């Protein structure tokens, strides 16, 4: 008897479940609430057990009776150590963590089985691969035990990244009755190739992937990743740019794109997040006063704070382009005679020895000056009060003589504190003593372009080689607080499968700059008619050379710097409105579509055309907004619908199925019109064949252009979709 597809179990496996390592932890953690609302206790997250993080992340429970508990007890009886309980986050999902160390005695047997099964080699000294193999076999073991006991309902297993994906080919080979989805957040080979300064996107189709992986010593890892992608029922990526990359490097065209989202906290009133910006900005101002003591000759009310942040990947994160653009911006501002000062922060962790003496001294002397001024102010206030109390109207004046307010002792104290601010050196460009100062790429480029924080420079630079936290003695802010206090985030990445940093800026109402080689940049560019009107600037790194891209970025920085305060406030309001596009309440629909597509492929007979299709028109409750909400490229779509999993246009590339029903963007920065926010999913009719779904692949430089045959096929497919006209197809490049 076939399994029921109406109440399936969902297992989601990732290396970062209850174990913060990187960005996938954020994806899993923030997505949980919407998934729990759909599945309840039919959802269980699976990951490796970290004895360091598990005690503070998970509340242990005993599994109850039933197929799930029986499967766990069966494994425990055979020596498997595991932790089952509730993840202590919003939604409190069930979580199952396997202790890979408890099965290391089986590792050689499993490595041999993997070689016989798939021809995948496994070097003995690669600890990460060893962990991946053991974890993959343990997950496949559990799924087999559970599927043998739970025979009524369908089972969906969703795997994130190659470290968790090995269970997919094992389930396929063992004929375990589970439906599998594999999501790659970045390809292994892509990261290595981009870090090697190759012209990655223009040569993507020409790489000999086996040779390149072998040359870099990651062939065995690449094989695991590729087998996971090919054996999964549904293969997805997090962005179109990664889909294009996966098609050429993993040799399978993804079935769709599942963009990353965030849990968006909406404020009751528009002014609330503006107030948070002002409060956080004042804390940054305090740091700036200390850092630039002795050369603090600029107006903080006429200062723009920019920043870039992330892992220290000098080229992949576009730090080289950012610094070059800052140097050109500095030249232009000086040439214009501008009074505006730009302070650019670079927040990236690197090897350091300690804080610099100058950075610590600056904060200390300004703090002492502030305390001294407060003491003197209190004494002056007391003298004014005493004078007013003694005034009788017969002699003296109502207001004391200003010279009598400041005593000689106060004058000496103030002079000492002010003289302590004098210094002969320039403000430092880095807050820490670097472990390898002479070879640090960021410092070397700052020296090359001569950004040394000179008094005449309009652009000042501060490199903070450590992630932010509120206990920092120099810049004591958490990352979120710091972002809220800045005016602009700059992330001109060359390789960025999605990019949470610009997304976090958007949710907090901070304008940002990204590129069309980042997943987030592609997402916003394809979704909005004029993203720059809403504070999302996109640098073209796909269709033009480096010099042109640097000039474009410099122009965007200059344009933002010359905005008035009112224009910046209006733009922040619009940027904050974009947060609804990044909310999991909307983007969670894309994961639901992927799961349904997987079930349709595994159990086609369980679906019939008379059933309502959940990919039909679904209105997302978004009110009329003030100020104006973003205008979409098409009036009939959800935030992720341009990447939706459909089956009509299997042969078309991403650009073949972009909606083109344009809305005019806002041109006036001060315009505050009201108009609707049309978030409606495109209605689609099912194809007769369930063999494939749309490929979420983009075609950056080197990709093909649309042929007449492609356009005709797109027209035919869209003409079958209710309410969507055939002239909405766009071969957009």
Swiss-Prot record:
Enzyme class: transferase
GO-annotated cellular components: glycogen granule
Domain of life: Eukaryota
Mechanisms controlling activity: Allosteric activation by glucose-6-phosphate, and phosphorylation by a cAMP-dependent kinase.
Binding site for alpha-D-glucose 6-phosphate: 271-272, 274, 277, 281, 487, 568, 572
Biased composition (Polar residues): 689-700
A GO term for molecular function: alpha-1,4-glucan glucosyltransferase (UDP-glucose donor) activity
Gene Ontology BP annotations: glycogen biosynthetic process
Residues at which UDP-alpha-D-glucose binds: 185, 191, 311, 496, 499
Alphabetized CDD domains for the sequence: GT3_GSY2-like
E.C. designation(s): 2.4.1.11
Observed effect of gene inactivation: Disrupts production of intracellular glycogen.
Keywords carried by this UniProt record: Glycogen biosynthesis, Glycosyltransferase, Transferase
Residues engaged in binding UDP: 20, 311, 501
Pathway as given in its UniProt record: Glycan biosynthesis; glycogen biosynthesis
Pfam families (alphabetical): Glycogen_syn
Recorded catalytic activity of this chain's protein: [(1->4)-alpha-D-glucosyl](n) + UDP-alpha-D-glucose = [(1->4)-alpha-D-glucosyl](n+1) + UDP + H(+)
Region (Disordered): 686-710
Homology family: Belongs to the glycosyltransferase 3 family.
Function field: Glycogen synthase participates in the glycogen biosynthetic process along with glycogenin and glycogen branching enzyme. Extends the primer composed of a few glucose units formed by glycogenin by adding new glucose units to it. In this context, glycogen synthase transfers the glycosyl residue from UDP-Glc to the non-reducing end of alpha-1,4-glucan.
Protein name according to UniProt: Glycogen [starch] synthase
Organism expressing this protein natively: Cryptococcus neoformans var. grubii serotype A (strain H99 / ATCC 208821 / CBS 10515 / FGSC 9487) (Filobasidiella neoformans var. grubii)
Record gene name: GSY1
């Amino acid at each position: 008897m076939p399994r029921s597809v109406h109440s399936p179990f969902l297992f989601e496996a990732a290396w970062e479940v209850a174990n913060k390592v990187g960005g996938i932890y954020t994806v899993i953690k923030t997505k949980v609430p919407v998934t729990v609302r759909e599945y309840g206790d039919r959802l269980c997250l699976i990951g490796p057990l970290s004895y360091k993080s598990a005690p503070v992340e998970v509340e242990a429970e005993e599994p109850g009776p039933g197929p799930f508990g029986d499967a766990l007890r069966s494994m425990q009886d055979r020596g498997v150590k595991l932790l089952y309980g509730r993840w202590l986050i919003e939604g409190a999902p069930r979580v199952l963590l396997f202790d890979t160390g408890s099965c290391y005695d089986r590792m050689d047997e499993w490595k041999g089985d993997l070689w016989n099964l798939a021809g995948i080699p496994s070097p003995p000294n690669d600890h990460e691969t060893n962990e991946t193999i053991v974890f993959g076999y343990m997950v496949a073991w559990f799924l087999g035990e559970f599927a043998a006991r739970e025979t009524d309902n369908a089972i969906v297993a969703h795997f994130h990244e190659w470290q968790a994906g090995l269970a997919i080919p094992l389930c396929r080979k063992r004929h375990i009755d589970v439906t599998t989805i594999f999501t790659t957040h970045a390809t292994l080979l892509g990261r290595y190739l981009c870090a090697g300064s190759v012209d990655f996107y223009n040569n993507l189709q020409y790489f000999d992937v086996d040779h390149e992986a072998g040359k870099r010593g990651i062939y065995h890892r690449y094989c695991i990743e590729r087998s996971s992608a090919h054996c999964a029922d549904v293969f997805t990526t997090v962005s179109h740019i990664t889909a294009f990359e996966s098609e050429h490097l993993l040799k399978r065209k993804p079935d769709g794109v599942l963009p990353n989202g965030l849990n968006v906290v909406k404020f009751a009133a528009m002014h609330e997040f503006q107030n948070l910006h002002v409060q956080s900005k004042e804390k940054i101002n305090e740091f700036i006063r200390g850092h630039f003591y002795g050369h603090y000759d600029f107006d903080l009310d006429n200062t723009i704070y920019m920043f870039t942040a992330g892992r220290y990947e000098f080229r992949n994160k576009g730090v080289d382009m950012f610094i070059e653009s800052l140097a050109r911006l500095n030249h232009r501002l000086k040439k214009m005679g501008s009074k505006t000062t730009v302070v650019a922060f670079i927040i990236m962790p690197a090897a350091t020895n300690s804080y610099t003496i100058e950075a610590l001294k600056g904060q200390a002397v300004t703090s002492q000056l502030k305390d001294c001024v407060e003491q003197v102010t209190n004494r002056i206030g007391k003298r004014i009060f005493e004078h007013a109390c003694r005034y009788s109207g017969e002699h003296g004046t109502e207001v004391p003589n200003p010279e009598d307010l400041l005593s000689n002792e106060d004058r000496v104290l103030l002079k000492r504190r002010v003289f302590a601010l004098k210094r002969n050196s320039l403000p430092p460009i880095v807050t820490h003593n670097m472990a390898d100062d002479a070879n640090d790429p960021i410092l070397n480029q700052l020296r090359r372009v001569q950004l040394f924080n000179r008094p005449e420079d309009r652009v000042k630079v501060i490199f903070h080689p450590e992630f932010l936290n509120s206990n920092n003695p120099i810049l004591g802010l958490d990352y979120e607080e710091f972002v809220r206090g800045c005016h602009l985030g700059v992330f001109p990445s060359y390789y960025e499968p999605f990019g949470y940093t610009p997304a976090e800026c958007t949710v907090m109402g901070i304008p940002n700059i990204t590129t069309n080689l980042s997943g987030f940049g592609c997402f916003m560019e394809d979704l909005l008619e004029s993203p720059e009107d809403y504070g999302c600037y996109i640098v073209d790194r796909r269709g033009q050379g480096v010099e042109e891209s640097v000039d474009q970025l410099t122009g965007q920085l200059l344009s933002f710097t010359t905005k008035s305060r009112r224009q910046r406030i209006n733009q922040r309001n619009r940027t904050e409105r974009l947060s609804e596009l990044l909310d999991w309440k909307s983007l969670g629909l894309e994961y639901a579509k992927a799961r349904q597509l997987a079930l349709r492929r595994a159990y086609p007979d369980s679906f019939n055309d008379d059933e309502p299709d959940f990919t039909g028109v679904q209105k997302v409750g978004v009110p009329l907004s003030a100020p104006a909400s973003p205008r979409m490229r098409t009036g009939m779509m959800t935030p992720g619908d341009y990447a939706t999993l459909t089956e009509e246009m299997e042969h078309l590339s991403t650009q073949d199925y972009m909606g083109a029903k344009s809305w005019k963007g806002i041109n006036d920065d001060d315009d505050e019109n009201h108009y609707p926010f049309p978030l409606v999913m495109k209605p689609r009719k099912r194809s007769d064949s369930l063999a494939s779904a749309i490929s979420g692949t983009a075609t950056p430089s080197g990709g093909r252009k649309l042929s007449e045959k492609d356009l005709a096929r797109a027209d035919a497919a869209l003409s079958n979709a209710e309410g969507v006209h055939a002239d909405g197809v766009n071969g957009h490049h």
